[in-house]
Structure formats: structure tokens, C-alpha cells
Amino acid sequence: MSMFLDTAKVSVKAGRGGDGMVAFRREKYVANGGPWGGDGGRGGDVIFVVNEGLRTLMDFRYNRHFKAKAGEKGMTKGMHGRGAENLYVSVPQGTTVRDAQTGKVIADLVKNGQEFIVAHGGRGGRGNIRFATPRNPAPEISENGEPGEERELALELKILADVGLVGFPSVGKSTLLSVITAAKPKIGAYHFTTIVPNLGMVRTKSGDSFAVADLPGLIEGASQGVGLGTQFLRHIERTRVILHVIDMSASEGRDPYEDYLAINKELETYNLRLLERPQIIVANKMDMPQAAENLEQFKEKLDANYGEFDDKPQIFPISGIAHQGLDALLDATAQLLAQTDDFLLYDESDMQEEAYYGFEEEEKAFDISRADDAAWVLSGEKLEKLFVMTNMERDEAIMKFSRQLRGMGVDQALRERGAKDGDIVRIGKFEFEFVD
């Protein structure tokens, strides 16, 4: 049993941590006040949260970038900066999150309300109150905030259509799908043009969205396997609302009402629960001769088979090819979906347990390369993070960074690569001389 795959690519960036502060306590009657600069606040995380009310990834086609706020800077009197609020992004139930570059699965979000941090906010930089020691009781050193994680993500959603288009072959289902969605189904004036389900995403003018499947043409005997038979019916089994498309022009020489009865009979024969799905009758091809007269006769026959207090299906006259009557149809469909509970979505054959295993080599602390101008270029996530968090306006901070590089083995590695006293070493746009 195949399912449809909805995809989207997004970029997420967590908030940067706030910078730590260099400050000193200066109060009357307080001798040797000492350092008083507080830490910066933590940057906000980007968190995906499952919302069972969402059905598609359509919203991510209009908003692809998500950025959390940075933490506040540290303050005097040793006060911490305020941490930033996390950014919550709603995703549909069943969304798989992958790293867009590696293809690695990061998360499977399957439970309503489930949360997963896709980008961690940076920690706040430390203020100078944190660097005081007996040997250096008044340090003029602080850290910049740590950058937040930034990554490109690929989202996948295995979905089944909310709405299924049913009807005899060539009643205009594929045409209707093509004009209400961006789908491009094969369209032709012959039976069984559609041999596999086509899926499209609808967004109404009021902002509602849902998935619509143009399902293979159904003929009498399908419940016994005639034509495309049970393959078709297993798809329609999983939809919540049925749009029953009828050719009101009777261009094939059939009575529209007889078509209506025949399709419903096949649905009933295959599975009684199919008729529990609410139906909307789509009276198509109303721009054709005789269509209006046929519609009136159809309504009379329909009324004769329903009691005064029975819930009759709604009828919407449209012309798919002329784009007439579509807005009212889509709004009514969205409203009906909102009132309809889920039916069976998965059976045992569709449920597959997946486990993800992998071995990741520990990333090197730094890399050394040679630029065209003969400068030595240092790179690497760990090294670059230390650099970004170093306040290069403070001599003490620069000296601390130099000690960190030495402790990581950068000096020794440069010597082994042939670096000489006075050579230029570059990290990003920052340059300094190598001292042997």
C-alpha cells in the first residue's frame, strides 16, 4: 500500500547567547570592589512540536526560515542577562526530520504534543565576575555569547489524502484536481486515464489546507476486482471526506443519477464503513448543454429517496474547466473536514518499525590549510566557536585564547607544517603573527 510523500526544506537558526560583561564594583565605603560583570542570557532554541490539527507541510512552502532570538547581554552588579524565549514551530503528526546535507534522520515526530529541539541556542558568555582568581582578583576579561546552532532541514510527511475524488471514469476528476491544486495529473478523454492516485494540496482563500486525491476511475464490479478494483477502493478507504464527482452533461450517454447510485453501491459492497464518510456531490461540467436540466432532474430523484428529516448530501454545481463554483466547494469541504473525525489511517501492513544506527567519527578540533597568499588558515567547529566567543577588544581575552590554542595543540601542529616566526595565521577575517 503506497502512501503519498509531502516534502519541504527549511532553515533553522537558534539564538545566539548574550555577551558577558566587564564591570567593576565602585561604591562608596567599598574598598577594592572587584569584578561585577554578569553573564549573558542563553539564546532561544528552535523546537518542533507536533500539532495533530495540521495535515500537510504546505505552510513551510511560504515560510522556510525560522530564527530564534538572542539572549540579552550580561549586566552590572553581577546580574545575568535574560534568556531568550524558545521558538516553537508546529509540524504535522508523522513528520520525519532529516539533515538536508547528510540525509540523516534527526527525529520522527509521531505523537501529538511531542517536542524536539532541532537547533540549540548558544549559551551566554561569562562576565568578568566569573574569571576572578586569587592571582587575578580584577580580571578585564569576558566572553562573547556562543552562536546558536544553524542547519538546513528536510521535512517529510507520509500522508494519506483527507479528501478523495470518486466517480466514473472521465467525469472530470483530474481536471478538477489540476485547477484546485498545483498537481499535474495526466488528463485525457478516455477511461482510466488515472491509473494511480494523484495527490494535490489545496489552500482555500480563508487559509485552510488539506490533501486531495484524484483516485482511479471506478466502474461497476470494482468491489469484485473489475477494472482497477480493490486497489482503488483501498485508497478511498482511508479518506475522511468524499467528493462524488458527477458528469451533469451526461456526455457519455449515462444518467447522472444512475452513476451516483452505481458508485455508492460499489463503496457499500466493498466496505460498509465507506458510506460513513460524509459526501459532497460535485455536479461537474455545468457549462455544457443540458447540464442545468439534468441537475434539476438529479435533485428531484435525490429528494425522492430521502426523508424530510434525513441529512441529504450537499450539491455544488461547478465547471472544473471553466473554474466556476470552486471557492464555495472548497470552503464547504474544509468545514466538513473540521467536523469529521479520523477514520482508519494505517493497517498492520503499513506499520514499519525503523531503527537508525550510525557511527560518527569524532570531529577534528581544528584543520590547517595554506591560503594563496601563504597565510596559514585555521578552521574547525570547535576552534571557530572558541574564537567567536573571545572578546578580541580585551588583551586578557586574547591572551586566554592564545593559551587555549596552545592547549589544543595548534602551535605544535603549525610548527610541524613548517610555520616560521612571523608567518601570518588567519581565523576567519582575524589575522595574527605566529610566534615561535
Swiss-Prot record:
Keywords: Cytoplasm, GTP-binding, Hydrolase, Magnesium, Metal-binding, Nucleotide-binding. Its cofactor is Mg(2+). Residues 358-436 form the OCT domain. GO terms for molecular function: GTP binding; GTPase activity; magnesium ion binding. GO terms for cellular component: cytoplasm. It is found in: Cytoplasm. It is an enzyme of class 3 (hydrolase). CDD domains: Obg. InterPro entries: G_OBG (IPR031167), GTP-bd (IPR006073), GTP-bd_Obg/CgtA (IPR014100), GTP-bd_prot_GTP1/OBG_C_sf (IPR036346), GTP1-OBG_CS (IPR006074), GTP1_OBG_dom (IPR006169), GTP1_OBG_dom_sf (IPR036726), OBG_GTPase (IPR045086). Residues 2-160 form the Obg domain. Mg(2+) binds at residues 174, 194. SUPFAM superfamilies: Obg GTP-binding protein C-terminal domain (SSF102741), Obg GTP-binding protein N-terminal domain (SSF82051), P-loop containing nucleoside triphosphate hydrolases (SSF52540). PROSITE patterns: G_OBG, GTP1_OBG, OBG, OCT. It holds the Pfam family GTP1_OBG. Monomer. This is GTPase Obg. The gene is obg.
